[in-house]
Amino acid sequence: MINTIIADDEPIIRNGIKDIVDWHSLGFRLTGTAKDGMDALKYIEQEEIHVVITDIRMPFLDGLELIKIVKKLHPDIYCILLTSYAEFEYAKQAINLGAYSYIIKPIDVDEFQKTLSNIKEDFEKCSRRKQYISKLELYIRQLEDFQNQNLFSHQKSD
C-alpha cells in the first residue's frame, strides 16, 4: 500500500478529498490528515509516507514550503499540490520544487484518480527497480565471497 497524507487547513476540503476516492482499491492507504504544513511535517517525521497531498495556502507552513522541506528530507516522496489559484507562478514554483502534480480546486475526480494511478505505476516501477538492485548487490557480494574463498583455499594448498 502507498501511504498518503492530506494537508489542508479547511476541514471540509480534507474530508472531501478523503471521501472522493476509494483509496484502497487504487492501492493507497490514507494514513492521516493535517490542518497545516507544520502538522504534516511532524506526521511525516513519525510515519513512512509515500505521498503528500497539500493545499498551497495554509497557516504556519504553506504547501510550497512543505514540499521544499519534504523533498529535501525525503526526495522519493510524491507531492501533489492543490490550489484554488490558477496562477502560473505557483505552478512554476511547484514544478521547480519537485511536485509531482498541480491540481486546481475544485478537484476534478477523474484527473485526481488519474494522478494517483500514475503515482502508483511510478511507485511500483521504482520499488521493482530497488528490489532488482538489492538482488544484484546480494549476488555481487556472494560472488565476491565465493571468489575470496576460492582464492584463500587455493593459497592454502600452495
Residue ranges and their predicted role:
Residues 11-32:
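Two-component/phosphorelay signaling modules centered on CheY-like receiver
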Residues 58:
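Receiver (REC) domain active-site loop signature in two-component systems and cognate sites
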Residues 42-43, 64-75:
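Short amphipathic alpha-helix used as the core "switch/output" element in two-component signaling
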Residues 8, 55:
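Active-site residues of response regulator receiver
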Residues 36-39, 62-65, 83:
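Acidic catalytic/metal-coordinating carboxylates
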Residues 107-158:
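Interdomain helical linkers/hinges and coiled-coil/dimerization scaffolds
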Residues 33-51:
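Acidic, metal-coordinating helix/loop segments flanking the phosphotransfer/catalytic sites
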